[in-house]
């Protein structure tokens, strides 16, 4: 039986849980997901990646190999990344450059605070994101102060 996303190819450049989970769900719905890792990156950086990488193909790519990266971009329908605006990899995913290679590419960027604005370079630490959302002050606990949320809710 065909799946919703049969025939769709997704490039996964995730470095954290938000983008990894996003591409996991796309894979669950039938997309071909290609997880792109640097040659020296560990396959699973944290325990969750063992699950979040299910159903994905994995390729190791030196991002200096522009021809290979552009080949992946040319064959993709969707690119999912979570690079911080200050990341050295940010230049790889500039929309204008990608559009020249593949004008139909959908570029999905998942960041804690967006690519522009005063908080764009803030680290995406769960407690900071929760505090800015106003969630920590509303959590129940046995003390009058905010309670640390163990589950990384903002990351997902």
Question: Which ranges hold each PLM region?
Answer:
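Phosphate-coordination loops involved in phosphoryl transfer and adenosine-cofactor binding
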Residues: 5-7
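PLP-dependent aminotransferase-like
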Residues: 21-63, 72-75
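Short glycine-/small-residue-rich Rossmann-like dinucleotide-binding loops
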Residues: 15, 63, 84-85, 111-112, ...
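Active-site loop-to-helix junction immediately N-terminal to the catalytic Tyr of the SDR YXXXK motif
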Residues: 18
């Amino acid at each position: 039986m065909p799946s919703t996303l049969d025939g769709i190819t997704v490039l996964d450049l995730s470095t954290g849980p938000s983008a990894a989970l996003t591409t996991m769900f796309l894979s669950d719905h039938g997309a071909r997901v290609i997880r792109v890792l640097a040659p020296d990156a560990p396959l699973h950086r944290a325990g969750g990646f063992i699950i979040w990488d299910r159903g994905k193909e994995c390729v190791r790519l030196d991002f200096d190999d522009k021809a290979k990266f552009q080949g992946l971009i040319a064959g993709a329908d969707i690119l999912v990344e979570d690079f911080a605006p200050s990341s050295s990899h940010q230049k790889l995913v500039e929309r204008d450059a990608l559009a020249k290679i593949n004008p139909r590419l959908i570029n999905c960027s998942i960041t804690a605070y967006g690519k522009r604005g005063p908080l764009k370079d803030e680290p995406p630490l769960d407690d900071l994101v929760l505090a800015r959302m106003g969630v920590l002050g509303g959590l129940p606990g046995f003390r009058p102060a905010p309670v640390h949320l163990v589950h990384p809710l903002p990351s997902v």
